[in-house]
Amino acid sequence: MSMRTLFQTLSVLALSALPALAQETTAEPAEDLSMGTTAAAAPLTQETAQVGQGYLATNHDLWEQRCEKTEDGKDPCQLFQLLKDAEGNAVAEFSIFALPAGGPAAAGATVVAPLETLLTEALTIAIDTAPAKIYPFTFCTVEGCVARVGFTAEEVEQFKKGAKATVTLVPAAAPEKQVNLDISLKGFTAGYEAIAATVPAQ
């Protein structure tokens, strides 16, 4: 048999197998196919945000400087950091903002913890090796449970000079355990000074 004849024979066999292959392919539902997900839109910027929308102004290492667009251009800002556990899983959110001078708190913060957190144990925040302070949870939404925190001017200075802070939560499913989440303070000083400049003078 010549090479050409052999090639023609193999081609016929291959074509004759296609209907059977199609039947096998369509007979069983495909369970390993990805249907895709919608790609995340690019973060809003000061130029693309509309009045009332939040946008990402810049980054200070792991801190995001998030602001809200206003009509007069005096956009209030805060610092945001996503907190992860030892395995790198996103667990909680930490946001801090400067307050007008003269009050007991120089800065305010919100911590959003998972709904599975044991609320009666509250949460603690420690800056480096300083003693931890306890803060209660204020309310819960479908996105998580929120603690509203106030920091004194002295504590803000500790944030600026420190290496890390630690948020500690207690899981409701394992009340005997604690989950420690590090807050990197690298870039905090520059970021805090930037958001403090957006606070209206009293």
What are these model-predicted stretches?
Residues Q23-Q202:
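A generic "folded-domain core" signal
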